[in-house]
């Protein structure tokens, strides 16, 4: 009996009722409460259930709020993209314009717009003088010049960058114009040289023909008759006289 009471009290099935033992087989007793159910009263179980339902409702409400917030953020982004003309990644650029009296463009203003930083005449003069001395500033020089001009160091740095770019562009334009003029001059000189060469060739043609005719000079017959022949058989020098006959023989043996 004590074993049966202990088994029925433990229940062996917390979710359902206990088990009643009768002999060798066991049968489920749905009417008997489980030990877990016996630990808590009905009021406590209702409070636990109500708290669980309340927490689940709060999670659902917070999830709906997050979804609404994300949807609203997406709508705001799309609206801003449409208002900015399709460029949603417009950045705020810090730049300075020309070094003249109108100054340059300063730091980007609100809403992605670019505001111009108006430089006074004294500021422009001081910047130009500093650029003539040093076109690249060190960290200390940049901060000192910004303090004198009452500007930000970044603005001074950007002004010097733009000034160097403009100087390089102007120098490139000057070099291009100079090379263009040199090319035109060389082209004209080449045309003149070609014309002079054609004139020289035209004038040199008759003179070359006359010089070629003078090279072929007719030798007189007396000179031709006085040619010295060597007889290969006897190795003697024979002087031929005029008329084709032998007028005289001057033999000298070359045999050793």
From Swiss-Prot:
Q: What is this protein called?
A: Homeobox-leucine zipper protein HOX18
Annotated region described as Leucine-zipper, given as residue ranges:
170-214
Extract the CDD domains matched here: homeodomain
Tissue pattern of expression reads: Expressed in roots, leaf sheaths and blades and panicles.
The protein's GO terms of the molecular function aspect are:
DNA-binding transcription factor activity, RNA polymerase II-specific; sequence-specific DNA binding
Name its cellular compartments. Answer: Nucleus
Q: Which InterPro entries match?
A: HD, HD-ZIP_Homeobox_LZ_Class_II, Homeobox_CS, Homeodomain-like_sf, Leu_zip_homeo
Do the record's keywords include Transcription regulation?
A: yes
Keywords, comma-separated and alphabetical? DNA-binding, Homeobox, Nucleus, Transcription, Transcription regulation
What spans are recorded as compositionally biased (Gly residues)? Answer: 102-112
Superkingdom is: Eukaryota
Report residue spans for region: Disordered: 52-116
Which taxonomic lineage does the organism of this UniProt entry have?
A: Eukaryota, Viridiplantae, Streptophyta, Embryophyta, Tracheophyta
């Amino acid at each position: 009996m004590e074993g049966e009471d202990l088994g029925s009290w433990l229940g062996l099935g917390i979710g359902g009722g206990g088990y009643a033992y009768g002999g060798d087989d066991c049968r489920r007793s749905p009417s008997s409460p489980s030990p877990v159910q016996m630990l808590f009263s009905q009021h406590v179980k209702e409070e636990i259930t109500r708290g669980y339902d309340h927490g689940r409702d709060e999670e659902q409400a917070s999830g709906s709020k997050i979804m609404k917030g994300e949807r609203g953020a997406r709508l705001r982004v799309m609206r801003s993209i449409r208002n900015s003309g399709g460029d949603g990644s417009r950045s705020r650029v810090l730049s300075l314009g020309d070094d003249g009296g109108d100054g340059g463009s300063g730091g980007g203003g609100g809403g992605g717009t670019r505001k111009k930083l108006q430089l006074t005449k004294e500021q422009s003069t001081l910047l130009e003088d500093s650029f003539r001395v040093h076109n690249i500033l060190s960290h200390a020089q940049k901060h000192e010049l910004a303090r004198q001009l009452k500007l930000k160091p970044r603005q001074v740095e950007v002004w010097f960058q733009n000034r160097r770019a403009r100087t390089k562009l102007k120098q490139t334009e000057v070099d291009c114009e100079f090379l263009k003029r040199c090319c035109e001059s060389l082209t004209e000189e080449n045309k003149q040289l070609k014309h002079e060469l054609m004139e020289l060739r035209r004038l040199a043609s008759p003179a070359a023909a006359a010089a070629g005719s003078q090279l072929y000079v007719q030798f007189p017959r007396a000179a031709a008759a006085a040619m010295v022949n060597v007889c290969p058989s006897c190795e003697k020098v024979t002087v031929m006289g005029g008329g084709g006959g032998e007028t005289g023989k001057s033999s000298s043996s070359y045999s050793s």
